[in-house]
């Protein structure tokens, strides 16, 4: 069974997933960040593939991607860095990246390399669901790679149900149609959206992302989903502290 399915089948509550951009702040720090996050109780990790035009991301992750590319990070190097990662960590690892670099690498080759490294899934924010269905699903399923789809407050109920019926792993529930970035709290409109999706009783578990940065936002997300994904806040702390251990301890402190 895929590690993503194992995690959610365990009925674990308040799942914490952390995003960071591979190659930032240093080119060779990827494995150490992953190792450190697992050590400190993170349940799942999203490894960002840097891209020059990350349209769904706010300024923090845009800057991290720019720095990672300047440092020389590429998909080829990332796969080389992660080739023995399963000797060190056992939690689910998910790539998050845009379609362009993945297509340049070749989608089937990308899936093959994911299997070799023990990557469990991929989130591609700019991959339309229809394109996934028509062109990529058969390849991803052949290799056992979960393609995680995003939904937003603007996603129709019909499309949400369609995504739920034709994907596996979890559904990434974006807290707003805006870009990524830390928020202090969620307003009533966002909370109502979370509840509406929760009340649809979908087949797939839900994870909330975009804007999670503190106890209030983390708890609000976990109230209506299996857990939450934190990206921008951890990326900021990682750059400030220059040490993944200090960064994750500071973040976990903010979630208490």
From Swiss-Prot:
Q: Which UniProt keywords apply?
A: Amino-acid biosynthesis, Aromatic amino acid biosynthesis, Lyase, Tryptophan biosynthesis
Annotated GO molecular function terms are: tryptophan synthase activity
Any GO BP annotation:
L-tryptophan biosynthetic process
Pathway noted in the entry: Amino-acid biosynthesis; L-tryptophan biosynthesis; L-tryptophan from chorismate: step 5/5
Q: What class of enzyme is it?
A: lyase
Q: Which InterPro entries match?
A: Aldolase_TIM, RibuloseP-bd_barrel, Trp_synthase_alpha_AS, Trp_synthase_suA
Q: Superkingdom of the source?
A: Bacteria
What EC number(s) would the UniProt record show? 4.2.1.20
Give disulfide pairs as residue numbers: none
Which reaction equations make up its catalytic activity?
A: (1S,2R)-1-C-(indol-3-yl)glycerol 3-phosphate + L-serine = D-glyceraldehyde 3-phosphate + L-tryptophan + H2O
Task: List, alphabetically, the GO terms of the cellular component aspect.
Answer: cytosol
Claim: Signal is one of the keywords in the record? no
Residues at the catalytic site: 46, 57
Q: What does this protein do?
A: The alpha subunit is responsible for the aldol cleavage of indoleglycerol phosphate to indole and glyceraldehyde 3-phosphate.
HAMAP family for this protein: Trp_synth_alpha
PANTHER family with a match to the protein in the record: TRYPTOPHAN SYNTHASE ALPHA CHAIN, CHLOROPLASTIC (PTHR43406:SF1), TRYPTOPHAN SYNTHASE, ALPHA CHAIN (PTHR43406)
The protein's assembly and partners = Tetramer of two alpha and two beta chains.
> Which family, according to the similarity comment?
Belongs to the TrpA family.
Question: Would you tell me the protein name for this molecule?
Answer: Tryptophan synthase alpha chain
Record organism: Bacteroides thetaiotaomicron (strain ATCC 29148 / DSM 2079 / JCM 5827 / CCUG 10774 / NCTC 10582 / VPI-5482 / E50)
